[in-house]
């Protein structure tokens, strides 16, 4: 399907609720309002309540997180019986891998190498250079053995490589420009700092070839940080965070509610993405917003489109190595999440959107306030310690210890399941997972909530510069 970026933008404007602005139905207003008003009431109870119930905001926070763990536990139960990821038979769909790069010269060659060396390489590799000012052009000249194309033009080597050179306009616009040159049935987005394992593309092909209604799929990623003290600590915490998060995605996939697809390594059916207008340049998390648009369009037209997470499609992706970069990343992620939840608020609680509307998006409505609940609970706990409120600290401490025990149990079980799911291709182990479960509530989790709260500030002030 040949298409221009102008036509993509026209389709985006005609489909996205950011422009169509549907009315917000009463269920959505009630769900979002309940989450916010409940926080106000629970926080007020800290000054009016007695005994352990003065810490009601913390109790609700613990109960909500435990409920999500229980949901994931139940839905991921079948993973204990996974033995392998069977290869599909029959015709294989054609695939273009799109690498978007902005000043990624040090890592770009390794990313391309990993694609070229796949057990089943993509039919085309399209490097979309978003106006890099570093040595990216030199790297690509050496790799493609071609002079740099003019801005807005594409150079093609005699191999599978294509080089699209664009003026700097952001990842989403560069991706949309690349889509106009894709000639295959599928395209896969790969960040320039993401290294795919050898069978990753094959696993993507398997999934799409066996399921004609699969519109998008995410691979399973492992975070890799720099070799510094802060990098090693953050990699430890983020590794187990990623394990839990990808298992959670599997759980939501099981109830047809998966919305979170990692653009660092994701596969899409080209016709579906072009139909809904490509990626939105005005969203901070263009991959996440895209999935909402795909699911909405599919439900509205009874197309049966759905999404998946693939345990056989594995990759390693660069993750923040310093607290500052980590907080900025989480600020962008959460700010973009709030943008998307706001734009698609008419789907919240709407039965016509199936489990996405009835379950997933109401949970996401609660998630908008989860970091605020968490930080409120922690600040109150500090206040009890400073003021010597022993009568509160003892029962609250018991609740926290009980939650840690639950987390320990879930962490151990999740490592067992995750290893089965990815075929043993992981370095995570039980000992470090248990240690992370003990330390995380008083360290890494607080930084996650701080970054998310910063995202709230950015969302409310409509900041787009990151």
Identify the function of each model-found stretch.
Residues 3-110:
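N-proximal low-complexity "stem/linker" segments adjacent to membrane-targeting elements
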Residues 93-96, 124, 274, 289:
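Cell-envelope/extracellular polymer assembly enzymes that use nucleotide-activated donors
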Residues 149-163, 167, 172-180, 184, ...:
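Long helical/loop segments within the catalytic core of UDP-sugar-dependent glycosyltransferases
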Residues 42-79, 87-89, 364-460:
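Membrane-embedded multi-pass helical conduit in multi-pass membrane proteins
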Residues 305-325:
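Active-site donor/metal-binding and catalytic loop motifs
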Residues 187:
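Short aromatic/hydrophobic "clamp" motif used to bind/position activated sugar donors
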Residues 272-275, 283-309:
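A short, conserved alpha-helix in the catalytic core of glycosyltransferases
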Residues 113-167:
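Acidic donor-binding segment of Leloir-type glycosyltransferases
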């Amino acid at each position: 399907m040949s298409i221009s970026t102008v036509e993509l933008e026209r389709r985006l404007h005609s489909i996205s609720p950011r422009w169509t602005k549907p009315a917000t139905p009463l269920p959505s207003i009630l769900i979002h309002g309940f989450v916010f008003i409940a926080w106000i009431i629970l926080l007020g109870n800290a000054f009016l309540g007695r005994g352990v119930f003065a810490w009601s905001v913390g109790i609700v926070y613990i109960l909500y997180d435990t409920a999500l763990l229980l949901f994931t536990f139940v839905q991921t139960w079948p993973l204990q019986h996974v033995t392998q990821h069977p290869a599909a038979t029959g015709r294989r769909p054609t695939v273009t891998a799109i690498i978007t790069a902005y000043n990624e010269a040090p890592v770009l060659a390794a990313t391309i190498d990993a694609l070229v060396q796949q057990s089943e390489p993509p039919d085309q590799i399209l490097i979309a250079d978003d106006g890099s000012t570093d040595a990216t052009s030199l790297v690509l000249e050496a790799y493609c053995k071609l002079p740099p194309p003019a801005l807005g033009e594409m150079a093609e080597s005699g191999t599978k490589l294509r080089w699209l050179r664009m003026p700097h306009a952001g990842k989403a616009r560069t991706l949309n420009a690349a889509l106009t040159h894709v000639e295959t049935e599928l395209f896969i987005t790969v960040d320039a700092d993401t290294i795919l394992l050898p069978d990753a593309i094959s696993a993507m092909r398997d999934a799409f070839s066996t399921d004609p209604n699969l519109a998008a799929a995410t691979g399973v990623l492992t975070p890799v940080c720099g070799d510094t003290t802060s990098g090693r600590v953050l990699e430890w915490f983020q590794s187990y965070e990623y394990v839990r998060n990808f298992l959670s995605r599997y759980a939501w996939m099981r109830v047809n509610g998966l919305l979170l697809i990692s653009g660092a390594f994701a596969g899409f059916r080209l016709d579906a993405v072009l139909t809904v207008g490509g990626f939105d340049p005005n969203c901070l998390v263009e991959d996440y917003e895209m999935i909402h648009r795909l699911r909405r369009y599919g439900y509205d037209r009874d197309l049966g489109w759905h999404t998946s997470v693939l345990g056989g499609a594995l990759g390693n992706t660069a993750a923040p190595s310093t607290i500052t970069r980590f907080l900025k990343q989480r600020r962008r992620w959460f700010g973009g999440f709030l943008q998307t939840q706001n734009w698609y608020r008419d789907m919240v609680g709407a039965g016509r959107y199936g489990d996405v509307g009835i379950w997933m998006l109401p949970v996401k409505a609660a998630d908008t306030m989860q970091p605020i609940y968490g930080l409120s609970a922690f600040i109150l706990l500090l206040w009890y310690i400073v003021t010597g409120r022993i009568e509160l600290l003892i029962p609250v401490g018991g609740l926290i210890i009980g939650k840690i025990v639950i987390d320990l149990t879930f962490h151990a079980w999740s490592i067992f399941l995750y290893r089965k799911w990815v075929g043993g291709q992981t370095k995570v182990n039980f000992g470090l997972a248990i240690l992370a479960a003990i330390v995380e509530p008083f360290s890494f989790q607080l930084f996650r909530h701080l970054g998310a709260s910063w995202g709230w500030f950015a969302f409310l002030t409509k900041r787009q510069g990151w």
